[in-house]
Amino acid sequence: MAKIGMDLNSFILEQERLYPNATGSLSRALVAIESATKVIASHVRMAGLADILGMAGKKNIQGEEVQKLDELSNNLLIQYLSQSGEFFALASEELDEPIFPEEGKDAKYVIAFDPLDGSSNIDVNISIGTIFSIHRRVNSDVSDFLQEGYKQVAAGYVIYGSSTMLVLSTGNGVNGFTLDPAVGMYLLSHPNMKIPEKGKIYSINESNDKKWIDAGLKEYIESLKDEGYTSRYIGSMVADVHRTLIKGGIFAYPADVKNKNGKLRLLYEASPMAFLTVQAGGIATTGKEDILNIKPTDIHQRVPVFLGGKYEMEKLKSMLKNG
């Protein structure tokens, strides 16, 4: 039985014991993620002193400016995940194509990740994070990444804020672990996380409301205001979703006239966050279909995202349908 204060490694081993045929491969894979994010956390804390803030002078596959800390985080994850030998392939927001580490040629899993979500906020000291999604290796090629979200073996994120916290699900609920820098360990601080069925916060960039293309969305937001909801929008998906998981409400990044297919990436942003939301008792949709039911067609595919508690999400689906 997991107890508050249990370290992440012990928790992972305890979960492994629930599966008599487990080989330990997933456990070792998760430990590799744990190790990499601890190092990233240390660099985030020192970023202002180490000349790793600002732009790296290049653009990623999305055409976005790469931040120096983004590039460092990406390299650290590639290093640790490759050396673990537990991943057949790695896909990143910062890579045009997946890489296939020599050490992972016999591995069981593939992983997609956003090394540093919200990196445009680095210079202003706002919470940022790492998001990851693990699938089973099936066909031993790029198509292993193009599996529906409900087939994820594990998903999670690490938020680098006032404290560093890793939020994880292996399909048996959601648990949060806070990094104790004194001992260098993630300790269970938020066991069995559940999103409230009804919250008081909506999180969306309302400055884009004239560009939204979902009929009924403006009316939906106005109806939440009429119910006394308050707006909280940070612009860092990890931070906004983290608050939504804990306090309830809704997080939304809808399609608009500029981004008709949505802005957030399915594989390493929308899908893992949807997995966590559903595991925590919430709902995640594009406005038209459940995010976890989408079969990806491209590694960097984008989708609209709405996720949150049952009350807000059921109301959203009803108003978008009738909008």
Curated annotation (Swiss-Prot):
* Record localization: Cytoplasm
The GO terms this record gives for MF are: fructose 1,6-bisphosphate 1-phosphatase activity; magnesium ion binding
Where does the chain bind Mg(2+) 1?
A: 93, 114, 116
GO BP annotation list:
fructose 1,6-bisphosphate metabolic process; fructose 6-phosphate metabolic process; fructose metabolic process; gluconeogenesis; sucrose biosynthetic process
Leader sequence residues: none
Any binding details for the cofactor? Binds 2 magnesium ions per subunit.
Q: What is its EC number?
A: 3.1.3.11
Pathway it belongs to?
Carbohydrate biosynthesis; gluconeogenesis
Instruction: Give disulfide pairs as residue numbers.
Output: none
The prosthetic group or cofactor this protein requires is:
Mg(2+)
Where is it predominantly found? cytoplasm
Q: Where does Mg(2+) 2 bind?
A: 114, 117, 269
Instruction: Name the UniProt key words of this record, in alphabetical order.
Output: Carbohydrate metabolism, Cytoplasm, Hydrolase, Magnesium, Metal-binding
Task: Cite the Pfam families for this sequence.
Answer: FBPase, FBPase_C
Q: Which reaction does it catalyse?
A: beta-D-fructose 1,6-bisphosphate + H2O = beta-D-fructose 6-phosphate + phosphate
**What InterPro entries does this protein map onto?**
FBPase_C_dom, FBPase_class-1, FBPase_N, FBPtase, Fructose_bisphosphatase_AS
An example GO CC term for this entry is: cytosol
- Residues binding substrate, per UniProt: 117-120, 205, 233, 263
Name the Gene3D superfamilies on file: 3.40.190.80, Fructose-1,6-Bisphosphatase, subunit A, domain 1
Tell me how this protein assembles: Homotetramer.
Q: Which family does it belong to?
A: Belongs to the FBPase class 1 family.
Q: What is this protein called?
A: Fructose-1,6-bisphosphatase class 1
Organism whose genome encodes this protein: Sulfurihydrogenibium sp. (strain YO3AOP1)
Task: State the encoding gene.
Answer: fbp
